[in-house]
Amino acid sequence: MPFMILLPDDTDGSSSSDWITAGIGTSSPDTALVDDNGDTSYVKCNDDNEFMIIDFANPSVAEADIESITSVQFLSSGRSSDRRSEALVDIAFQVPSGFEESCSYDAHASSHETINGTAREVKPFGGAVWEYSDLENLEMKCTKDGTEEVYLGYLALKVIYEQAVSADNATFFGANF
């Protein structure tokens, strides 16, 4: 099935100040989280209950080219900076709200661990199927759980969809063969 990846493109300004952007060429969390490059660029936090809200880019596939949306799933990569204890982050859909999952990133000196969320076939609260307009306003909220410092290096959304079938009704009459 075809899929597209939606990357962070902004923060909504309501993030707490304790998520710090670090690394080369980054000035905000959305720029730090767009590629899975380990410790080259990332956001970090070690304060319990601190959060950041990330807005995602609009779909790269036109609405007319999508018959239906099969699922939406977050993809992430991170690590604990403590060599003995994992670091916990709760990742949830902010818009539409719901579907929170806890990610426990392993303790490691430099390697980031990939943790992907559950592929969600329906929207939170109500169970309605995903619509294209839902993809145009997606936000995720990351909340630090505990005080072990976490480095979050990648956050994206994978959207699996059914491709629209275009009918080939263009019959050629009067063609000169």
Residues of each region from the PLM?
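Disordered, acidic Ser/Thr/Pro-rich linker "stalks" and the adjacent N-terminal cap
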Residues: 4-50
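A short beta-strand element within beta-rich, extracytoplasmic domains
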Residues: 57-59, 63-81, 140
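Short, surface-exposed beta-strand/strand-loop-strand elements in extracellular ectodomains
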Residues: 83-98
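Extracellular carbohydrate recognition and processing domains
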Residues: 100-129
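Short beta-strand-plus-loop segments that form exposed binding edges in beta-rich domains
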Residues: 141-148
